[in-house]
A protein has these predicted regions:
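Fe(II)/2-oxoglutarate oxygenase catalytic core
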Residues: 1-101, 107, 113-175
Length: 175
């Protein structure tokens, strides 16, 4: 019974992830591991780490380029439990709303702070991007964002040129 509920929940989360334009545009998803639902109760934490380079899914290995945490519980339902991402000498703490997600390079050192009250419920997954290099992926994402923001403010010819550059870079940088 629990396995069936878990599989159904994981399927719903995977479908939501694939339907999210922001996630698709940022991650350039090739494939990803089925979401794993994680429950943290008081005194539970997950120490500093970077995620593994590969994740086994059934009989195949998926390269982990991007890690994704999907928040399943409202932040008011628990205390502590922040996802803390270490970016050089800066630290970013995230405690997202239910249904929100945070994506970050799997090479990033991060941790989950101790839950002090209530229950933290999240799903995690690992995305294999079509573009391995995070800097190239970020450049292409930024280029596409600028093109989308400019929209009809630029001439048709320049839109076509931007689309050509974007598609060419995507093709050149893809695995």
């Amino acid at each position: 019974q629990d396995d069936k509920a878990y599989l159904e929940s994981s399927k719903i989360l995977a479908e939501a992830l694939l339907a999210n334009e922001g996630v698709k545009n940022f991650a350039f998803i090739n494939r990803f591991a089925p979401p794993l639902i994680c429950r943290y109760q008081p005194d539970m934490a997950y120490g500093k780490h970077a995620d593994n380079a590969f994740v086994q899914v059934q009989n195949t290995m998926i390269r982990s380029d991007i890690s994704c945490t999907i928040f399943l519980e409202h932040p008011e339902a628990y205390e502590g439990g922040e996802l803390t991402i270490h970016l050089g000498d800066k630290t970013v703490s995230v405690k997202g709303k239910a249904g929100s997600a945070v994506l970050y390079p799997s090479t990033t050192i991060h941790e989950v702070m101790p839950v002090t009250k209530g229950e933290r419920l999240v799903a995690i997954t690992f995305i294999e991007s079509q573009i391995i290099d995070e800097h190239k992926r970020d450049l292409l994402y930024t280029l596409n964002e600028v093109a989308a923001l400019e929209g009809y403010n630029i001439s048709w010819d320049n839109r076509v040129r931007l689309q050509h550059v974007s598609a060419s870079l995507h093709r050149m940088w893809s695995t």
